[in-house]
UniProtKB/Swiss-Prot annotation:
The gene is RAD51A. PANTHER family: DNA REPAIR PROTEIN RAD51 HOMOLOG A, RECA/RAD51/RADA DNA STRAND-PAIRING FAMILY MEMBER. It comes from Zea mays. Keywords: ATP-binding, DNA damage, DNA recombination, DNA repair, DNA-binding, Nucleotide-binding, Nucleus. Its main location: nucleus. This is DNA repair protein RAD51 homolog A. Belongs to the RecA family. RAD51 subfamily. SMART domains: AAA. GO terms for biological process: chromosome organization involved in meiotic cell cycle; DNA recombinase assembly; DNA strand invasion; mitotic recombination; mitotic recombination-dependent replication fork processing; reciprocal meiotic recombination. The keyword Cell membrane does not apply. Residues 49-78 form the HhH domain.
Length: 340
């Protein structure tokens, strides 16, 4: 068999696997008796997959114009048949988790404490003070996620929401050169959007979902997830509204990770804690966003500065990773191991 025929066969097998395991296009609800017009209403409201419908609360479906209580119940029943949300055995879950892909960070030491790299299907939060390497740690996976699986990649595209205006395509070209990838192809495979306020940032997630149903994405970056909340909401009077808005945004991110299996990486800013000990040990930093941000993140990483371009990453919380530290370096070609 020729190499072209083998590639075609491999692509067909991958496509068949996606059909069997999802995400399922929302149009599949029509086969379960849902009218095409109602499917269009769901799609127009930002629900592009059957999974998205299955994860949506009934009261949210009722807010969609033209969806009555009877229709909502019928839609929920149809979605639950395609995407079962009941119990499964721990052995089945274990088998599914063995198939989870990790995207390399570019540093072997960092990959080691992450047990392979950035995990797909979950949210990884990176926080630290300015110049601690948060944005650089977002740029490198945008390239490495395009690598083949056997090279620590995800064989998919990247999506980047930039709230601070710090995204630099030329850095991606330098990183692509390091990994032997075509620079033009790498840039073409990164979808970029600048977010200007918290509402716009949330709307971009709806657009992201429609893009992910069309093509394979392996990574989604939001840099920073909290920057706009610090400016759009001010004072204690708006604290409750800020936290509610942030909780909905983070929940939408988790839904994208669940629906499409993408690795979601978000950066977070910090605030200095000034107390009596700061006089002797220097100011201590804590991430903003409170408990809502802490609970939304699957894996939480803290960055701090070392000597020169050296940075230290510490695993703060994770359901399966040990609390550990790794040293890495900020280089022109992205995140790399420290050269002793």
């Amino acid at each position: 068999m020729s190499s072209a025929a083998q590639q075609q066969q491999k692509a067909a097998a991958a496509e068949q696997e996606e059909v069997e395991h999802g995400p399922f296009p929302i149009e599949q609800l029509q086969a379960s008796g849902i009218a095409a017009l109602d499917v269009k209403k769901l799609k127009d409201s930002g629900l592009h997959t059957v999974e998205a419908v299955a994860y949506t609360p009934r009261k949210d479906l009722l807010q969609i114009k033209g969806i009555s209580e009877a229709k909502a119940d019928k839609i929920i029943e149809a979605a639950s048949k395609i995407v079962p949300l009941g119990f499964t055995s721990a052995s089945q879950l274990h088998a599914q988790r063995l198939e989870i892909i990790q995207v390399t960070t570019g540093s072997r030491e960092l990959d080691k404490i992450l047990e392979g790299g950035i995990e797909t299907g979950s949210i990884t939060e990176i926080y630290g003070e300015f110049r601690s390497g948060k944005t650089q740690l977002c740029h490198t996976p945008c390239v490495t996620c395009q690598l083949p699986l056997d090279q620590g990649g995800g064989e998919g595209k990247a999506l980047y929401i930039d709230a601070e205006g710090t995204f630099r395509p030329q850095r991606l070209l330098q990183i692509a050169d390091r990994f032997g990838l075509n620079g033009a192809d790498v840039l073409e495979n990164v979808a970029y959007a600048r977010a200007y306020n918290t509402d716009h940032q949330s709307r971009l997630l709806l657009e992201a979902a429609s893009m992910m149903i069309e093509t394979r994405f392996a990574l989604m970056v939001v840099d920073s997830a909290t920057a706009l909340y610090r400016t759009d909401f001010s004072g204690r009077g708006e604290l409750s509204a800020r936290q509610m808005h942030m909780a909905k945004f983070l929940r939408s991110l988790q839904k994208l990770a669940d629906e499409f299996g993408v690795a979601v990486v978000i950066t977070n800013q910090v605030v200095a804690q000034v107390d009596g000990s700061a006089m002797f040990a220097g100011p201590q930093f804590k991430p903003i966003g409170g408990n809502i941000m802490a609970h939304a993140s699957t894996t939480r990483l803290a960055l701090r500065k070392g000597r020169g371009e050296e940075r230290i990453c510490k695993v703060i919380s994770s359901p399966c990773l040990a609390e550990a530290e790794a040293r890495f370096q900020l280089a022109s070609e992205g995140i790399a191991d420290v050269k002793d």
